[in-house]
């Protein structure tokens, strides 16, 4: 095979991959006869991002690496490709997820203490199944309750490189503020994912407590 432009190889790999790719993973595409440094990979990624600046897709860096995705500006048109409405999220799920995001690591009991009601096992299971949260440790007290934290999958879903990019909450004990502020952000992401055809509908709907 004749010599290929490495930028084109990287572009093809990013489109072919179902998951974000790191510069290190992209470097593995090139053999010892045609080595390429990490700095070169990053430069080529920057060039690709610029190449697509006026296109319908964007090269986005998230926690797990780089990926191509549709620009949110085109969501009104892309939504017409899918008949399903995006899933609505229950207040209980929004509050539970927001508390994990902003107070991690946190136990189920601590979430219940703040919310004042029991946390549905179904909500915890769905967040775990979605891989938005995981058990990161166990509290060193009798019973050793699991402590939950967010994952790279969560960051990827929200197009974040780190939790530091999340908007601050002045008081995470204020559940009205949690639902309004975090819920608004989640709704925007869900709308975008629905436009891209990547938003599953397997999360609890608003009728849950």
Swiss-Prot record:
Q: Which SUPFAM superfamilies match?
A: Winged helix' DNA-binding domain
Q: Which GO terms describe its biological process?
A: cell division; chromosome separation
Q: What is its main location?
A: cytoplasm
- One GO cellular component term: cytoplasm
Q: Which domain of life is it from?
A: Bacteria
Kindly list the places in or outside the cell where this protein is found, as annotated in its UniProt entry. Answer: Cytoplasm
Give a Pfam family name: SMC_ScpB
Please indicate if the UniProt record lists Cell cycle as a keyword. Answer: yes
Keywords recorded for this protein, A-Z? Cell cycle, Cell division, Chromosome partition, Cytoplasm
InterPro entries reported for this sequence: ScpB_csome_segregation, WH-like_DNA-bd_sf, WH_DNA-bd_sf
Family membership noted in the UniProt record? Belongs to the ScpB family.
NCBIfam families per record: SMC-Scp complex subunit ScpB
Q: What does this protein do?
A: May participate in chromosomal partitioning during cell division.
Protein name per Swiss-Prot or TrEMBL: Segregation and condensation protein B homolog
């Amino acid at each position: 095979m004749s010599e290929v432009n490495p930028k084109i190889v990287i572009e093809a790999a990013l489109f072919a991959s179902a998951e974000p790719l790191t510069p290190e993973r992209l470097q593995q595409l090139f053999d010892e006869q045609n080595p390429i440094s990490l700095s070169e990979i990053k430069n080529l990624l920057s060039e690709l991002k610029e190449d697509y600046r006026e296109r319908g897709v964007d090269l986005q860096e998230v926690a797990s690496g780089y990926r191509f995705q549709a620009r949110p500006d085109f969501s009104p048109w892309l939504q017409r490709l899918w008949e399903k409405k995006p899933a609505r999220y229950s207040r209980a799920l929004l509050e539970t997820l927001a508390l994990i995001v902003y107070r991690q690591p946190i136990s189920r009991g601590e979430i219940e203490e703040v919310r004042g009601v029991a946390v549905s096992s179904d909500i915890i299971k769905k967040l775990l199944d979605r891989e938005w949260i995981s058990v990161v440790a166990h509290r060193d007290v009798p019973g050793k309750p699991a402590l939950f934290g967010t994952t790279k999958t969560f960051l990827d879903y929200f197009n974040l490189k780190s939790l530091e990019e999340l908007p601050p909450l002045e008081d995470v004990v204020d559940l009205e503020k949690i639902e309004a502020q975090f819920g608004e952000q989640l709704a925007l992401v869900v709308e975008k994912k629905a436009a891209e055809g990547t938003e599953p509908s397997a999360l609890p709907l608003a009728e849950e407590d």
